[in-house]
Amino acid sequence: FHYRAAETAAKYKLMVDFHGTYKPTGLNRTYPNVINYEAVHGLEQMKWSDIHTDQVTYDVTMPFIRMLAGPVDYTQGAMHNANKRCYHSSMDTPMSQGTRCRQLAEYVVFESPLNMLCDSPTNYDREEECTEFIATIPTVWEQTIAMNGEIGKYITMARRKGDVWYVGSLTLSLIHIS
């Protein structure tokens, strides 16, 4: 399916984002129109995840493992956020674990040429500063530097587009980095 879809899309000069599929295996080298793969426990999973799901730890682990295979269609950008103690699954008002700033940092840390929005448009209307940042952040970078990190604890990435640098950092909820 993937090869046929990529080939057909290329024939018609269309880009492909394989959402809900396995990790990249090199198909995008043959078909550069394939720009993204999900293959992660993306944020939409939090709608039905139970209180034992630790998305914060997952988010500081995934870049070291899954992202090595290629771009990630993660669906970040939740505007309704809670700490682990207050988090609960909800189909009506889904939320993320962590903070809104954490959600914004994921746009820098996670490599994704086609970023998604996981939340309701009305939530973005209420958070104008966040929405402006998401709308203007580049999705393709000229330079990337992994500044520091430890699997499952923290990660800091710096990415440059033109003369502008963006720095994003994700940590565990209770970690202190000196």
PLM regions and their residue ranges:
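Aromatic- and carboxylate-enriched substrate-binding clefts and catalytic-loop regions
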Residues: 1-95
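Active-site-proximal structural scaffolding
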Residues: 2, 9, 98-102, 127, ...
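Acidic/polar loop patches that form or flank catalytic/metal-binding clefts of enzymes
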Residues: 13-20, 43-48, 115-127, 141-145
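Conserved, mostly hydrophobic/aromatic
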Residues: 16, 109, 167
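Catalytic domains of carbohydrate-active enzymes that cleave complex glycans
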Residues: 93, 102-121
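Glycan-recognition and catalytic regions of carbohydrate-active enzymes
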Residues: 119-166, 170
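Conserved small/polar residues in nucleotide/adenosyl-binding loops
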Residues: 175-177
